[in-house]
């Protein structure tokens, strides 16, 4: 391994052990750093210590020429600034060339969410029969929409995480932070109907584990597997616009705020470390209010 490769690995270890970043987040950092190293190799720059502010400006120009979105460019800058801050802390460099790099302010991109008619179509798919995998998909949809948890968090739910007496689930979120989220009667009924079928399937394939959600072989359902299941549900519902599974989380937050929930509660339910991450949904609800007004008021 080269010296540069060792520095990269030390940084990734730091993100995992000291910052408690998830594998997905660490991988995003790694990809951004490797892309920058590719650029440095093309510029005949062999060491991170040799990078100057001018080199960084050239790199940013290249990113813009490749038509990366503002969000992607901002993320790459943030990743590399963090990496060089780490190198500075480790006395590998004496100055961070990313310190004074600015970027165009990100355009506000409102989260997309499902409309009520679309949610009804999704639920019709998972209530069409009582086959084991349909029951599982019913749990999947009821839990994701009913709690607002991330797909990756849903994949990690164990039977021991369910507290049926309080109708709450222990969730392990980003940075291994734990929180309890409540679930409603629909999710509770879906889980109850599913558990006996889950047991039968696991006995058939001689599986023993505590994961709530399983695939057709009785193995734990992965994050990728959940996305695949949701994509199939969305396809069966014949929804025409471009949509993605994470919209269930957006829909959860938007529906809560539209129906009067306070911001702090929604923040806690979503597991957001900062209130600013939750405030994006207020823009969605304002758009909802405006569109409703424009549609229904006679003087709009």
Curated annotation (Swiss-Prot):
InterPro entries named among the record's database cross-references:
CB (IPR044068), DNA_brk_join_enz (IPR011010), Integrase-like_cat_sf (IPR013762), Integrase_catalytic (IPR002104), Integrase_recombinase_N (IPR010998), Integrase_SAM-like_N (IPR004107), Recomb_XerC (IPR011931), Tyrosine_recombinase_XerC/XerD (IPR023009)
Cite the CDD domains for this sequence. Answer: INT_XerDC_C (cd00798)
Question: For this UniProt entry, which segments traverse the membrane?
Answer: none
Pfam families membership? Phage_int_SAM_1, Phage_integrase
One GO biological-process annotation of the entry reads: DNA transposition
Enzyme active site = 150, 174, 246, 249, 272, 281 (o-(3'-phospho-dna)-tyrosine intermediate)
Localization recorded for this chain is: Cytoplasm
What's this protein's function?
A: Site-specific tyrosine recombinase, which acts by catalyzing the cutting and rejoining of the recombining DNA molecules. The XerC-XerD complex is essential to convert dimers of the bacterial chromosome into monomers to permit their segregation at cell division. It also contributes to the segregational stability of plasmids.
* Subunit-structure text: Forms a cyclic heterotetrameric complex composed of two molecules of XerC and two molecules of XerD.
- Protein's recorded name: Tyrosine recombinase XerC
- Which gene specifies this protein's sequence? xerC
């Amino acid at each position: 391994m080269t010296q540069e490769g060792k520095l990269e690995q030390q940084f990734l270890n730091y993100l995992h052990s000291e910052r408690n970043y998830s594998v997905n987040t660490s991988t995003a950092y790694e990809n951004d750093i490797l892309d920058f190293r590719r650029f440095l190799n093309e510029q005949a720059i062999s060491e991170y210590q040799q990078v100057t502010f001018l080199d960084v400006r050239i790199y940013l120009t290249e990113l813009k020429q490749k038509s990366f979105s503002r969000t992607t460019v901002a993320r790459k800058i943030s990743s590399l600034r963090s990496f060089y801050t780490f190198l500075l802390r480790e006395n590998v460099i004496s100055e961070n060339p990313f310190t004074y790099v600015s970027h165009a302010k990100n355009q506000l991109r409102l989260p997309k969410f499902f409309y009520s008619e679309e949610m009804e179509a999704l639920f019709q798919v998972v209530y069409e029969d009582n086959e084991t995998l349909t029951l599982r998909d019913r749990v999947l949809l009821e839990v994701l929409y009913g709690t607002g948890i991330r797909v990756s968090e849903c994949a990690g739910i164990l039977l021991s995480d369910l507290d049926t007496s309080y109708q709450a689930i222990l969730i392990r979120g980003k940075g291994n932070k734990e929180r309890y989220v409540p679930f409603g009667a629909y999710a509770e009924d879906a889980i109850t109907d599913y558990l006996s079928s889950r047991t039968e399937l696991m006995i058939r394939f001689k599986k023993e584990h505590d994961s709530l959600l399983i695939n057709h072989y009785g193995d734990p359902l992965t994050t990728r597997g959940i996305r695949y299941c949701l994509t199939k549900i969305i396809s069966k519902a014949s929804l025409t616009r471009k949509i993605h599974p994470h919209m269930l989380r957006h829909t959860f937050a938007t529906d809560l705020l539209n129906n009067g929930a306070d911001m702090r509660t929604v923040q806690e339910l979503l597991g957001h470390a900062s209130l600013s991450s939750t405030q994006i949904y207020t823009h969605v609800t304002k758009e909802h209010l405006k569109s409703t007004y424009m549609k229904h008021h006679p003087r709009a």
